[in-house]
């Protein structure tokens, strides 16, 4: 009978090193440049709220998350003014939640953009969104050769 071996494995983040790394990146990119801290998968297991707190302390006010629930979790943790970008499209029924939480969605088709626009109009809120362009992998996003469909979402 095979029994899977158990081993101790973990990941730790040194906040002092993270702080140093952020300062180094900011120095390299220069003043006035926007940096977005990616916090997908609970900051890759390091704790999104903990990492976002260090990012905010270093003047980074834009965060990328993979899912709607990750974005909502950051809002509920007190990240109310920062831009939170949902890096993957969400189904149209969730447009109201995106708008209520003032999250910045990625849109990859007209139907998705229209649902978010209608939800924002209904709530009287302007939402900043990002248009996803398919860069050749064929996973998601507008085809850059189809500029007419991209124009439709303006």
PLM region spans:
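Active-site-proximal beta-alpha core segment in soluble small-molecule metabolic enzymes
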Residues: 2-5, 9-12, 20, 33-154
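Alpha-helical packing segments of well-folded alpha/beta enzyme cores
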Residues: 18-21, 25
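Conserved PLP-enzyme active-site core in the AAT-like
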Residues: 28
């Amino acid at each position: 009978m095979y029994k899977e071996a158990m081993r101790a494995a973990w990941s730790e983040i040194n906040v002092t090193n993270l702080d140093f790394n952020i300062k180094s990146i900011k120095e390299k990119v220069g003043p006035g440049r926007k940096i977005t801290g990616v916090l997908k998968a609970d900051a890759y297991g390091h704790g999104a709220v903990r990492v976002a707190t260090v990012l905010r302390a270093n003047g980074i006010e834009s965060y990328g998350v993979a899912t709607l629930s990750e974005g909502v979790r950051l809002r509920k943790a007190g990240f109310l003014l920062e831009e939170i970008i949902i890096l993957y499209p969400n189904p149209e029924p969730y447009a109201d939640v995106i708008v209520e939480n003032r999250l910045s969605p990625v849109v990859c088709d007209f139907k998705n953009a229209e649902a978010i626009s209608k939800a924002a109009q209904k709530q009287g809120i302007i939402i900043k969104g990002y248009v996803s362009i398919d860069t050749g992998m064929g996973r998601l996003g507008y085809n850059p050769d189809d500029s007419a469909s991209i124009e439709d979402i303006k």
